[in-house]
């Protein structure tokens, strides 16, 4: 049976939330979670870093009122997406695999566009990328067992993670890149990257969780939404 480990009880209720699109660089990020419970402490400890070799930097996707980013057109030449002045965000959601005593933590990043510069501009508005880390929580000292990064067509699995892709045996280094006319994707790298403020699913407001469940981003839901989260966990699991 699936057991989702929560820091605190999450309110479940029927809500009606009006969703408003906001300019991609005007979304206020959530404050980073505090290490005030075992799950948040674990998620902060194993938070990956992101090295941007090309393309947009990650931006906040949704604010506390449930307003979401309207993205950025792939054809707006000269428009910067090097990071929001309001701060950036990485979204986390966790699942406890009781059969193996492993915490599976998904980290997801939102990008206002996914554009590749070839002889012509190709791409689209709004994009998500994600990676899943697998942490052995059977002992007092949690250990990173594996990482699954969403690649070009499927998951790239690092089981066990390479030591030169890690900082302090905990923070996995990911590269955001593209090849040829492919879309952007994630892979392990030796290059140090940047950290974004982490907001966990259970710490988001009801409005934000509701609207991120309902919102379709370039034909798909956010990877932390119910429609995708459990499917991706099943597909990526390396054990």
From Swiss-Prot:
* Source species: Plasmopara viticola
Q: Which residues form the signal peptide?
A: 1-19
Q: What does the entry's domain section say?
A: The structure of NLP effectors is remarkably conserved with a high level of conservation of a central region containing the conserved undecapeptide motif AIMYAWYFPKD and heptapeptide motif GHRHDWE.
- Please provide the record's keywords in A-Z order: Glycoprotein, Secreted, Signal, Virulence
Entry-linked InterPro entries: NPP1 (IPR008701)
Q: Which GO terms describe its cellular component?
A: extracellular region
Know the name of this protein? Answer: NLP effector protein 5
Q: Where in the cell is it found?
A: Secreted
Protein task:
Secreted effector that acts as a pathogen-associated molecular pattern (PAMP) recognized by the plant immune system. Seems not to induce necrosis in Nicotiana benthamiana leaves but significantly improves disease resistance of Arabidopsis thaliana to Hyaloperonospora arabidopsidis and causes an inhibition of plant growth which is typically associated with enhanced immunity when over-expressed in Arabidopsis.
Q: Identify the glycosylated residues.
A: 203
Q: Does the keyword Glycoprotein apply?
A: yes
Conditions for induction:
Highly expressed at multiple time points in both early and late stages almost the entire host infection process.
Residue numbers of motif Conserved heptapeptide motif? 123-129
* Main location (coarse class): secreted
**Lineage of origin:** Eukaryota, Sar, Stramenopiles, Oomycota, Peronosporales
Family classification: Belongs to the Necrosis inducing protein (NPP1) family.
Keyword hit for Aminoacyl-tRNA synthetase? no
One Pfam family, please name it.
NPP1
List where the motif Conserved undecapeptide motif lies: 104-114
